[in-house]
Amino acid sequence: INYAVVTVVGALLAVNGHADVASLASYLVFVRQAAMPFNQFTQLSNFLLTALAGAERIFAVMEMTPEVDEGKVDLVRVSGYESGEESWAWVTPSGEKTPLAGDVRFDDVTFGYDDDQTVLANLTLFAKPGQKIAFVGSTGAGKTTITNLINRFYDVRSGTITYDGIPINDIKKSALRSSLGIVLQDTHLFTGTIADNIRFGKLNATDDEVIAAAKIANADKFIRRMPRGYNTVLTSDGANLSQGQRQLLAIARAAIADPPVLILDEATSSIDTRTEALIEKGMDALMAGRTVFVIAHRLSTVRNSDAIMVLEHGRIIERGTHRSEERRVGKECTSWC
């Protein structure tokens, strides 16, 4: 603004013969050079304030007391002597190994993010090995909270959650979370090749395993159409892919991890109808023999579930199959059928 004012005033003086053009040009250069240090100081001050705020947050995180993991039971991959295929097994503190089945149970679980808030109240449910359990309900009903508790991102206020009969508090957090494959509504990809992004689900995976996982998710065809195929470099957060393509890569990432338990949080919400139809076949193959939890806002996306739980205000108000829920004429069906 100051520079513009000086320019206008100087131009008027030059027009009226009170100053020549050369003097005006020299004065304008002087004004710009004189103002430059102040502008740079202002920018530097803003940068320093931002850096100080970031540093305070970093030190606050570094000074936080780490959560104590009291889990003693571990979970490892073991290879079959004859088939060579890997499977999951529990390892007790004594070293005894027991095959993992994938039985997940909630017994009278109550939970709230704050002491004066209850998100889930007296929740009881179970998922047998190989079953597909779906949760439907409005936003804030507690669907995602259930999956957060399975991951043990939070501890329950009362009640118990067991995994193959083992209380999840007795399982090492790293072991528990390594056995869970999660496909979220928002897909997070990293700068790097497509193959590396898929391999993030299993860092030591071979190229053949990467391709096999992509085929399960029906992502192989679009990947091969990319300029460099699986070696195509993705920009930050996969900005050079469509939302549907990013979602397919997230599904492939879950497939390569080969988890015994899958959590699908609106995994097809950002995919068009045609793409959704493409992944359904792959998802059926991916879910075979696994315990699956599906979060959805409408019943049409969970039609093949073994059981559908309709949640409202942290409670299960309906249980049934897709067919039985569609036949209901109450509030639940009219909202999500």
Model-assigned labels for residue ranges:
Residues 52-63, 72-86:
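Extended non-transmembrane interhelical loops and adjacent amphipathic helices
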Residues 60, 67, 199:
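Conserved E/DxxT/N motif and adjacent residues on the DHp alpha2 helix
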Residues 2-3, 47, 203, 239:
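Alpha-helical transmembrane segments of multi-pass membrane transport proteins
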Residues 71, 78-328, 335:
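ABC-type nucleotide-binding domain
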Residues 1-28, 48, 84-89:
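A hydrophobic transmembrane-helix motif
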Residues 28, 35, 177:
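Conserved catalytic core of two-component sensor histidine kinases
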Residues 8-12, 56, 266:
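Transmembrane alpha-helix boundary and packing residues in multipass membrane permease domains
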Residues 34-64:
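Cytosolic ends of transmembrane helices, especially the final helix of ABC transmembrane type-1 domains
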